[in-house]
């Protein structure tokens, strides 16, 4: 009983300190005038202010991303573009690398556990990565206001998906369709909770692959990563088991985001002063988030993430349309 109490107390203490760090960081990010009050040699904002604020804010994002079950890029792009004085191109470039870092860290382990399926990932990745390149080129060619408006609409759409989406641990797939049979997309994995061997196959392969064209374009255009869309398509439409869908989606990000990230890198839209503190903050926050996950209430965290995305999506939409944002 004592250890349980201490564990809970430790979790809430961590949440308290995270909130305490987040308040001044978000306040500073929301008001450039406040940042400008920090003295520097030339009377301008000190060079270390924004990297420090980025580190703190992304640390909080890393915690929320783990607890809310969303990718870091989904939180990073709308929040940083909405409340920080950075150009959207730089934010999208950094957002892709934030999503990519988590995918690269998780990919080898998921393949080793036989949860991520190469047979499922390769045809999907071929389509999504090619379309992500196209999406990145479109995103860089369009005016910033249009991309910002579309980003806000997309984030609000993600909120709707999170509110309405259902999950199916083991979808019922009566028989594999002709395309998945020809590509030999099937597999076996061991369910850790029961020790049973699960044979799986997929159907509705062609509609799923067509949807990944749209997902790839959106991932490249907005720098969000695409885990929020990959899992529902793989799980609910194509019928892959939930664990296989989540693991394959994570592995897919390491391919899709890499292709789009090269476009932003080639155009000079990746700034180390933004990317380095963001990656460090997200990774450290993810480590803390895993610990808090043991004692936090998932339902509360999920609603908190949805509220945060709703707020950031509305901010991005109004910013793109040039409307005043009223809290």
Give residue ranges: language-model regions.
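Juxtamembrane transmembrane-helix boundary motif
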Residues: 1-64, 82, 88, 112-216, ...
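Membrane-embedded alpha-helical segments of transport systems
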Residues: 97-105, 128-134, 138, 252-259
């Amino acid at each position: 009983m004592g250890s349980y109490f201490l564990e809970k107390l430790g979790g809430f203490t961590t949440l308290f300190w995270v909130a305490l760090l987040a308040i001044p960081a978000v306040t500073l990010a929301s008001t450039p005038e406040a940042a400008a009050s920090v003295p520097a040699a030339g009377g301008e904002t000190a060079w270390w202010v924004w990297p420090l604020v980025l580190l703190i804010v992304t640390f909080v994002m890393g915690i929320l991303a783990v607890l809310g079950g969303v990718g870091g890029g989904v939180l990073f792009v709308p929040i940083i573009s909405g409340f920080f004085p950075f150009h959207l191109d730089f934010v999208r470039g950094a957002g892709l690398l934030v999503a990519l870092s988590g995918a690269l860290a998780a990919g080898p382990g998921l393949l080793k556990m036989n949860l991520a399926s190469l047979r499922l990932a390769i045809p999907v990745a071929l389509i999504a990565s090619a379309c992500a390149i196209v999406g990145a080129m479109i995103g860089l060619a369009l005016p910033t206001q249009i991309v910002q408006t579309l980003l806000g609409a997309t984030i609000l759409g993600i909120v709707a998906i999170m509110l309405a989406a259902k999950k199916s641990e083991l979808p019922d797939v009566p028989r594999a369709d002709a395309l998945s049979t020809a590509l030999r997309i099937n597999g076996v994995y061991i369910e850790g909770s029961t020790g049973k061997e699960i044979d799986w196959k997929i159907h509705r392969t062609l509609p799923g692959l067509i949807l990944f064209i749209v997902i790839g374009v959106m991932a490249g255009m907005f720098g969000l990563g695409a885990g929020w869309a990959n899992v529902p398509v793989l799980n609910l439409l194509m019928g892959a088991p939930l664990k296989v869908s989540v693991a394959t989606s994570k592995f897919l990000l390491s391919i899709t985001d890499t292709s789009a990230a090269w476009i932003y890198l080639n155009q000079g839209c990746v700034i180390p002063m933004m990317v380095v503190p963001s990656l460090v903050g997200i990774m450290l926050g993810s480590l803390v988030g895993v610990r808090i996950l043991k004692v936090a209430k998932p339902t509360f965290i999920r609603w908190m993430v949805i509220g945060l995305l709703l707020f950031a999506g509305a901010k991005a939409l109004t910013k793109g349309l040039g409307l005043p944002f009223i809290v």
